[in-house]
């Protein structure tokens, strides 16, 4: 998808202070510490991270050294950056697009789609393919968790609306049709139980028991 090309080596170097330190906290009004807590709450021993960005959240997830973790992204720069950061873990890096069948073997106990859905090509019915693809590689009791920035129907400030419009014009986001209700529907199509809440302009979710 178009937005992933923005993740250059230089951008990844400034990602944590710029995106997590400023945009997430100030523009989207969602505390980064809360997102770290959700990682710690939901992550399990056999974990798949789709769109790991810099590895910031995995680094803080409380996993013991040597824990096997699979990271998946279409951008090799992301995979390289996160792999270097997470050397204390047993990382398997997979270059792949979540909107296509995942080239993975075995099943996972948990998976994260953090900050990914608002970047995927819309509408939400099209993004549902990525959710279904992840659900297909989860164990029967597995959990998918993450967060996504809502479209204009979400609770936005003047500043966040300006940034939402700018990111969609540039093709970094594709979420003008993303609603909390719609997100709940695509999660519910692939999972039996869905928890969904809004913090600032972001929807935070956890979905368990993938449908077979």
Regions found by a protein language model. Give the residues of each.
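Class I S-adenosylmethionine-dependent transferase superfamily signal
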Residues: 61, 133-134
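A short, conserved alpha-helix within the catalytic core of class I
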Residues: 120-133
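C-terminal alpha-helical "lid/dimerization" subdomain adjacent to the S-adenosyl-L-methionine
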Residues: 145-196
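Class I SAM-dependent methyltransferase SAM/SAH-binding core
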Residues: 46-101
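A conserved beta-strand element that flanks and buttresses the S-adenosyl-L-methionine
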Residues: 112-115
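Short glycine-dipeptide loop
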Residues: 138-144
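Conserved class I S-adenosyl-L-methionine
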Residues: 1-42, 56, 152
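Core SAM-dependent methyltransferase catalytic element
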Residues: 190-212
